[in-house]
Amino acid sequence: YQRKIRDTVGHGECIFGIFDDYPENPDFLERGELCRIEKLCVEWRWRLRGKAHRLCQVHGDFHPWNVMFREGTDFTVLDRSRGEWGEAADDLTAMAMNYIFYSVQKHGRLTGDLQEIFELFFENYLDKTHDDELQSVIAPFFAFRAAVVASPTWYPLLSGQTRRILFNFLWNVLRSESFDYLDVNSYLK
């Protein structure tokens, strides 16, 4: 678990590695903003370090493009990444971030059907797992996923305004003790 948390923050495929690929001074960020985010992520690493009881089997890259549906509810999950053991919040945020991402691109906020499915996704997970700690450990995983979808390399056609909203989300989630999935729009401001 300690290694998974460290890797989420500092691995070349995760937060620090994604930031390595950002331009030196992108228009949508203040000078030094990535450095301040990285410092906050290191604090999260140490906050979560002792939660080894949360170690569980994970997919590691559980997003919509890795779920292939056939008939009805029959599906296959593709492309397991970064090992089979980790933190459930990683898989949850990999999927959930997409609902935020697509809604923010179109509306500048989480709304409509995407808000409904986002909230149902969270409620279903919490109802089935009784994971009372999830909302207090989820921040660095949402930060990682927000850094990916705001990336100029991975998503070159996004507007600066959309990237800024995603970074507002990233900041506000990292600054919160607990994530309120019913109030996502407050994190986007």
Q: What positions do the PLM features span?
A:
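Regulatory N- and C-terminal appendages and interdomain linkers associated
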Residues: P152-K189
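Active-site acidic catalytic loop and adjacent metal/ATP-binding pocket
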Residues: V42-D90
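All-alpha amphipathic helical-bundle segments outside canonical DNA-binding/catalytic cores
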Residues: H130-F142
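Active-site catalytic-loop/activation-segment of kinase and kinase-like phosphoryl-transfer enzymes
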Residues: Y1-R47, S151
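Charge-dense, low-complexity intrinsically disordered segments
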Residues: V9, E24-C35, G108-G112, V137, ...
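Active-site activation/catalytic loop segments of kinase-like enzymes and analogous catalytic loops
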Residues: A89-T129, A143-Q161
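Extended, well-ordered alpha-helical scaffold segments
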Residues: G32-L40, G112-F121, T162-V173
